């Protein structure tokens, strides 16, 4: 057998010619230590802040978020189970900053903080992704809030109105209806074209399921995205959930559309951030929160804005929720968020247990946007309401002493009692703006003064259905023209007088 060298070299040349090797370069490191959802990683020198790192384990890939970039190691918050990550395990850089899917593909879905679906409806076919952390629009990019965003709750729309692009805080103790206000507001956006994002942070899965079921029952899931970071999820996921939800809302804001985001609640997000920060050995400040906790909330809430006309005039409205302990509004996190937002709706346990629901304390609740977020019609009926109720609260305290009251004081007390009753509203029954105007008109113009207090809500319900039947043009004119002209005022007065005769008969 003869071996031909040139034949062999020819075969080798042909083999080499067809060989294509793809070189894949990835910067890797090693885990120095791991525990409590935090890993210290060595070797990923070009790692960026907020970059996703991959931890390959025998049970699949776990992702982590690079938070501390130190001289000799990187502090990583692990966004999943850390029990399979061992000391000395390999870590890979992804080169990607944390981002989430955005757009209409996410509507009606329940997702976690990193954009994975958790509703069992299959993968999300998103065409666009957006970074979780982006810089808020600058001063020139914005315009002042000038358009109402109705909550459907008479007490809020009349006295602490919310405008598109505003940040209005909902604050109060546990279990007094903070989430109920947020859910009612979402339900009320049904025909407004506003996309809603509900961010649940640190809540029980059963609570989130209940909210989702309520939204589904009222047909609100068609225009709502739910971002859930439950109580059992790692602190890192709870910390970035509001930013993830905000990125989804910004997509609509930047497209010239309108979005509403609810953070339920930022107290739990602050606690999660405190946990992560302390485990990363960042120095603690007041109440053991890290020094940048104010910045953490301000950079999130500043992303809610009303953009100017050149940028499409879109808006993102934020309703952050803060839970207080025994009504202490002067604690660290509540004071921080109050100073960042454009007003607050303060809910009070005493009112809640007295049956005033929504339990809004009129004196402590404000909207720093105010009349700019109201239509002319709403301003006309609600102008005196806040003052009347504040005076009623003062007089009520005096009336308890049982001293003889003059007629004017007695009349004011009677009006206040009826207005307080009129502002009560059952849960999941938001009211269109034109019906709110009609209802408040009846109260502020004295048409309820002779009605017994316990019959006020019955009067309101029957009066609105009477107007629907006999005078539908009143409601349609309020809706279209957004102002109560002298002619319309006369019609409204006539309708109410006619109904009062029927109601008492």
UniProtKB/Swiss-Prot annotation:
Q: Which UniProt keywords apply?
A: ATP synthesis, ATP-binding, Cell inner membrane, Cell membrane, CF(1), Hydrogen ion transport, Ion transport, Membrane, Nucleotide-binding, Translocase, Transport
Q: How does it sit in the membrane?
A: Peripheral membrane protein
Intracellular or extracellular location(s): Cell inner membrane
* Any single Gene Ontology cellular-component annotation: proton-transporting ATP synthase complex
Q: Where is this site: Required for activity?
A: 365
Q: Which Pfam families match?
A: ATP-synt_ab (PF00006), ATP-synt_ab_C (PF00306), ATP-synt_ab_N (PF02874)
Record's function text: Produces ATP from ADP in the presence of a proton gradient across the membrane. The alpha chain is a regulatory subunit.
Q: Spell out the PANTHER family in the cross-references.
A: ATP SYNTHASE SUBUNIT ALPHA, MITOCHONDRIAL (PTHR48082:SF2)
Q: What is this protein called?
A: ATP synthase subunit alpha
Name its species: Syntrophobacter fumaroxidans (strain DSM 10017 / MPOB)
The organism's lineage is: Bacteria, Pseudomonadati, Thermodesulfobacteriota, Syntrophobacteria, Syntrophobacterales
- Gene name, please? atpA
């Amino acid at each position: 057998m003869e071996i031909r060298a040139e034949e062999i070299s020819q075969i080798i040349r042909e083999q080499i010619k067809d060989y294509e090797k793809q070189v894949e370069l990835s910067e890797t490191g090693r885990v120095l230590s791991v525990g409590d959802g935090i890993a210290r990683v060595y070797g990923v020198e070009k790692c960026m802040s907020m970059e996703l790192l991959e931890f390959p384990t025998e049970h699949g890939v776990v992702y982590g978020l690079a938070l501390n970039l130190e001289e000799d190691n990187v502090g990583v918050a692990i966004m999943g189970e850390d029990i399979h990550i061992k000391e000395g395990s390999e870590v890979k850089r992804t080169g990607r900053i944390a981002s989430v899917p955005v757009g209409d593909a996410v509507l009606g879905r329940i997702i976690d903080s990193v954009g994975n679906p958790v509703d069992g409806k299959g993968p999300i076919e998103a065409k666009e992704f957006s970074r979780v952390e982006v810089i808020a629009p600058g001063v020139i990019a914005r315009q002042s809030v000038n358009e109402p965003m109705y909550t459907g709750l008479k007490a809020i729309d009349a006295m602490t109105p919310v405008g598109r692009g505003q940040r209005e805080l909902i604050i109060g103790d546990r279990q007094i209806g903070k989430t109920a206000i947020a859910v009612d507001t979402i339900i009320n956006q049904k025909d407004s074209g506003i996309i809603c994002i509900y961010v649940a942070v640190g809540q029980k899965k059963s609570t989130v399921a209940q909210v989702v079921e309520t939204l589904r029952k009222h047909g609100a899931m068609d225009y709502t995205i739910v971002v859930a970071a439950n109580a059992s999820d790692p602190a890192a996921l709870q910390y970035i959930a509001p930013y993830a939800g905000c990125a989804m809302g910004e997509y609509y804001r930047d497209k010239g559309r309108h979005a509403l985001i609810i953070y339920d609640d930022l107290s739990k997000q602050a606690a999660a951030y405190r946990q992560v920060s302390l485990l990363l050995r960042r120095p603690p400040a007041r109440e053991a929160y890290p020094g940048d906790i104010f910045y953490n909330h301000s950079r999130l809430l500043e992303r809610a804005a009303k953009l100017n006309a050149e940028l499409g005039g879109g808006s993102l409205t934020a309703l952050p929720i803060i839970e207080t302990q025994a009504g202490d509004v002067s604690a660290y996190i509540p004071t921080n968020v109050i100073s960042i937002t454009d007003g607050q709706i303060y809910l009070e346990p005493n009112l809640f247990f007295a049956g005033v629901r929504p339990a809004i304390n009129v004196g402590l609740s404000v909207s720093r946007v105010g009349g700019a977020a109201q239509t002319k019609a709403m301003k006309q009926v609600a102008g005196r309401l806040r003052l009347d109720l504040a005076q009623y609260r003062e007089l009520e305290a005096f009336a308890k002493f049982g001293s003889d009251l003059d007629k004017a004081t007695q009349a004011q007390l009677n009006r206040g009692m009826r207005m307080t009753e009129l502002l009560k509203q059952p849960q999941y029954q938001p009211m269109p703006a034109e019906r709110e105007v009609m209802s408040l008109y009846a109260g502020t113009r004295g048409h309820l003064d002779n009605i017994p207090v316990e019959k006020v809500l019955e009067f309101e319900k029957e009066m609105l259905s009477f107007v629907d039947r006999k005078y539908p043009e009143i409601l349609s004119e309020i809706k279209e023209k957004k102002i109560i002209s002298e002619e319309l005022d006369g019609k409204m007065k006539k309708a109410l007088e006619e109904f009062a005769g029927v109601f008492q008969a």
